[in-house]
Structure formats: structure tokens, C-alpha cells
Amino acid sequence: MNLAVRDSVSADPNAEAAVRTALRDNPDGVLEAVAAAHSVTYRSVLDCLPAENAAVASKDKFDRIWDDLTSWGDVVFIVHTEDGVFETACTIPAGTHARGYFNIHGDSPLGGHLKIERCAAIYFVDRPFFKRRSCSIQFLNGEGQAMFKIFVGRDEAKNLKPEQVARFEKLRTETASKGEA
């Protein structure tokens, strides 16, 4: 993969090698920090993860993935920007498409309106984060940045919920592959 071609920013010709080295040297670090340090998009960093750590699904799979997530129970919904990281533990409510938005509604702290046509790809990410396994489904926009992320929940002992890990792995197998979305 040539990051200079894939990114909207002009990347260093050696950026891919530098990103891969950073990921190898610090496999459980913050991916947004890797992107910033190497002047590449977040998506480019995801694309440099080993195949066992990231698989990509087409944006056309959004409804299938979202519908499945509504039956997982409590997960962690995260929005990570340069200005902060916002997270809430919640169930994923059902949604409907209307007036150019995917409208989220239901008995959950999570509600709102997504411009889902801006979703360019959906990544299934399974990697260590601060020395613990972390599984997430990440929705990326056309600029290569994360719109939001949905993480498999943890129990009181901070272990991933095994039933959600099984659902994550099954959904990844059914909808994603390593490579272009």
C-alpha cells in the first residue's frame, strides 16, 4: 500500500514503513497518536495493522452490522477527536434511515442522527490496548478518520465479555475481509 496515494495529505514516501515500525515497537499504543506522528490518516494506520488485527467491511454492510449490534447488550461507544475522547457504556439502539440521516432512537443513553452516507468503511479491530485485548468495530469517513467506534464490553473483572467476543468474531467473518472496502 502506498500511503502517499491513499491519503488526502501528502505523506512521506517512507511513511508506511515508519507506521509499521511504530506499530511493531508499540503494538498496544494509541492509533490516533501514530497517525498524527507520521502525518497520515487514521485509516492508513489501520491498513498497516497485521491481517489478524484488522479487517475491513464495505460501507454497504452498515445496516447489517448495526442491526446485529443492537442485540449485544452493553458495549462502549466512543468518539475520539483531537479535542477529546468521549465514551459511554450503553446498548446500541435501533435506527432508521430518514431525511438523509440514520436516526438512532430507543431506550439507551445513545441517541442522535448520523450522516451515514459519510461512512466510507467499517473496520473490525482486534488488538492489544494497554496490554489487554480490545475488540472494536470502527466506522470511518471518507477523510480516513473515525466517525465513532463501538467496543466489546468488559465485565467487572475488566475481561472482555465472551459472548460479545463470539458475536464480534462471527460478524467480522460474515462481513469483512483484509483489504479494500
Residue ranges and their predicted role:
Residues M1-A181:
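Eukaryotic intrinsically disordered, low-complexity regulatory linkers and tails enriched in Ser/Thr/Pro
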